[in-house]
């Protein structure tokens, strides 16, 4: 460490000052009972096990003293505290007894801890002085020491000569002048330390066998003063430092103060004896602002005693953890290896001090041998043509890493870390020259010796030496705008700088301090705020600084600092480290806080990239900001022994040494010369980083514009050679073996609109074939990314690609035979044309050349599927695709076919409909009618999604059949990168149209570039591991073949077997919830009802609730009621095999009552539903249910919480057509209300689900086949009519009125009056969607044999929908059914929302229940009648609007439909 024992006393004398030793803590009881224990000890057993330490003889040496050896505990020190502010007038309170009480409080807790090890320890003794009026503290301490010695000698319970004693000497340097950086230069009086040493000398002479804790409570006293805001006794004047005391200065001075005490005591005679020692025990708080005043427990007796015990358990020199309750540490225990109290000797403290210092650091220079160091022939006007020698001015913004804190400090000189060595700063320092000091400024001076702006020497940002290094130690992102303002003003006002003409390079690096403190305020230090603050600074530079190249260096990967902190073999002042960066170092491995830090760190980096990639700073030709990411993945440098290498750090182990500054400068310089997208993000700093030279072809500092050259890509592949022998197998095909590329498809492959300008909608008809992702060959990979341009990097003789523009018949198209608007049925003609062209063209050796043909089809089919669902069925789609592939398979040799998924129609809808101001929404029906004109949550949209799934499924089945794997020279590989598109979303939530042509449908060149990269990546990925997601905004580097895997991947060389679709064994669900416990006490309010609180389930309804036909009948008898499988009340089996509401609830409460089992009425439980029931039967069922509950001996009617589900209406609708004049809606609502009134009056503690009736006509439309015949025979007369009949239309209106009639029950006044009763309408059937199979037809597996009732699969889906509705707030419930199979669809209660939702706890309409007038019976028919009128008017308006849409004029772009 480098501190010399000879100067310890001198340092301590200078640091201590005049403060009177005293303690100020919060008043507490003087015994252990009633104490506020730290959170880690509350309600928990004593954590230490004394028995594990074994039974040993009492220690003969204080340096092997175990807690069990201690026989006596005592304390001295003047413990004065302010009284509790809540007890009245502070100045009138009697303070006479308080010092004794406080001391006894602390010592009692400490004695109780020790008593676990040494049960015979008597009550502690405190001698804290008896005077009320404060007087000289040193004199009082002498008196206390003498009284203590006399007391111990007279104590009959104590063997004074042979018993081990623990004596605590409390003192406080209340002036805290030692925290001023200038304290070492001020000759402060040293009386305080002299008297303390005198007291210790007295104790050493008089007291045998003693372990003395010298406890410094300076900060406790200060915090107590701040917390209570007043002192009764005169307090010493606070020390006003002559200069600003920064956080860094404070923690360094704290450490220095502590080390001075340690060094003094460790080298004193106290550590040389066997029966007496003194150990310094510091009490420093975390430096988090306002933490002290937030928690008075930081000054209570228990916390102080607990912290003192932990200090005794820590080796000297390793007492690094600050005092904290908010992030408390557990009580520490003696270990078997170190069962004793730590002294300086048994901590090997002096040995560590005297360890030979590392050799003095030699500053790293460099040599630059670049052939071209000349500036541009004329001063450039574009930042994208800027050579290093053109730079005239250099500046920097940031924090202490740029200010250079400690960069030139000698090893061990921790105090010198306060010095800012700006001349050594990596990004802007200019000390000496490049031969001795490597910095960016010194590198640039090799190109332009007249460079200005660099800093030299030492000093703060305001010193002349700093010049344009305006970084501020301790700076955070929020401070950057002020720094930027000052930098701009300095450049404008300095006569050496030609502000308008000089080219400037400014490096901005920030974020370390933000991450170090992020956990104290996640909102304040959020990634968004971080980048917003950077943006504000950059905005100033962008607005005011001409001719500037700004390096934005991303925040370093700070979590690796933990390696240095945790490695005890490497010396570091850990107290400083932890105080400077608590949020990185104080949390445990695998903690959620650490995971949050890593996430924030990554998001800081990602958000920085996004800020710049937005183009916000590329609006001028003379200004740009470039992200330099070399710090993003920096591993902790290691020594040859594998330990963290602290030679890369300043003596505080936090800031950079000159070696790190040198490596950072080299890495920054190299980053500046690397193209964007190809910049190095990972460095091993232990390896010296060579300085590269500008590329003679591209001699400029790299910007986004001059790197990408439009939409180019860098290919890092080194091995670009073809196979040694021309391959005969498609499974041994390398990229360089490909000689021909071709493509088939629709307008996406034809290239419509790829190069169109954003506002040029008519230009979308232009086919930019040369830019097409799979077949275009315009330019080169350096500026145009396409699959052919990638392949041309491997084989310059590649042919077949298209160039320029034109249709499929143009010469430029060559083998890109895609046709705009083409459908699957058109593929055959494209295949025929393609084969003929390949046979006729002399550039193609038809039989010998290896070919890659990419096929993408299906988008245009989906655009028209709704015009004829049979013509565009999945069966017809795959039939046409199969025929085309069969011809290629049969007639074209040496082919690898890429079969690419089509663009998901959902993405097209999101972009097109999400940007009505940018997209031609008026032309939706012309551009892609069956995709763009559908309503959200409509049956038509569900059918579109089913068709899309069916198309994809049929493609997979076709390829997976092995049909095209029968020849050695032919294979079809499905490339699935299009399966999941991650659509970029702008800050306003709208989809990003910058990836699309002006019609918002076709991809533009930006999109095509990503498609080409994704296709190439897929081609190199083995089957079974192919990427199925395309993130359009992600940086997608080009992957390369490897030596072990050099081939384009096929099923065979991937060792892949296509999976067989497994049969589904049951319709159970997986239970993934973690919040499953009941309330701590039985709730009295239905609005605080958790699922586990439910004791009883019940149900009312018809045959859908008795589960008629849920399973096939084994006889010709009438259908069976499978009550045990019923969605809302069945309890057969368990959730893993049968998904029902009771089986879900049984996961929360295994003792649930009331559910049905099996098929017999005797096991129906509280399922009172009956086949054929209508709404008029609900009151009778309600009475039946009430009687069953009252008569059940297992149910406590008054105390048990009950969940009742009512679902009725199907039979009412089925028979409506027999008497259409009846007031069905009015009567329906009245009957259900009567049933609910009965339940409300008779059942305490009840939660009632009222499920809206499904849309009957929608659910049963289009069943066809056997079901069509059964529908004509069943008792539901209304379903016998055709979909277009007036009767069926009238049924739909009545159906809507029934739903509307009961939809407001949740809000009715009479059901919100009781605290223990609620009615909640569950609307998942409001918009009923017919379940569809993979072919887009009605999925009959959801229905029973009679095609009317639900099968067990249908019951499972209803149970899931009901359960999920129950966990959704009123007003935000799902109003449509999603009948698709997944075992993981069940929602879970959360810690934030653990209750079943009612109107009140949904908080949507908090006052509605109180304000709504009571619903009168006479008002029901009126409401129903109004609802009917509204329904009729709404239907007419909707039809008119739809008719209006059909009359939109056609558009000429119809020919470019997908």
Swiss-Prot record:
It catalyses: a 1,2-diacyl-sn-glycero-3-phosphocholine + H2O = a 1-acyl-sn-glycero-3-phosphocholine + a fatty acid + H(+); a 1-O-alkyl-2-acyl-sn-glycero-3-phosphocholine + H2O = a 1-O-alkyl-sn-glycero-3-phosphocholine + a fatty acid + H(+); a 1-acyl-sn-glycero-3-phosphocholine + H2O = sn-glycerol 3-phosphocholine + a fatty acid + H(+); a triacylglycerol + H2O = a diacylglycerol + a fatty acid + H(+). It is a single-pass type I membrane protein. Sequence repeats lie at residues 39-347, 362-707, 708-1054, 1064-1402. One of its GO terms (cellular component) is apical plasma membrane. Expressed in the epidermis (at protein level). Disulfide bonds: none annotated. GO terms for biological process: diacylglycerol catabolic process; phosphatidylcholine acyl-chain remodeling; phosphatidylcholine catabolic process; phosphatidylethanolamine catabolic process; phosphatidylglycerol catabolic process; phospholipid metabolic process; positive regulation of acrosome reaction; retinoid metabolic process. Its main location: membrane. Pfam families: Lipase_GDSL. InterPro entries: GDSL (IPR001087), Lipase_GDSL_AS (IPR008265), Phospholipase_B (IPR035547), PLB1 (IPR038885), SGNH_hydro_sf (IPR036514). Residues 1439-1458 are cytoplasmic. Calcium-independent membrane-associated phospholipase that catalyzes complete diacylation of phospholipids by hydrolyzing both sn-1 and sn-2 fatty acyl chains attached to the glycerol backbone (phospholipase B activity). Has dual phospholipase and lysophospholipase activities toward diacylphospholipids. Preferentially cleaves sn-2 ester bonds over sn-1 bonds. Acts as a lipase toward glycerolipid substrates. Hydrolyzes fatty acyl chains of diacylglycerols with preference for the sn-2 position and of triacylglycerols with not positional selectivity. This is Phospholipase B1, membrane-associated. It comes from Homo sapiens. The lineage of its organism: Eukaryota, Metazoa, Chordata, Craniata, Vertebrata. The gene is PLB1.
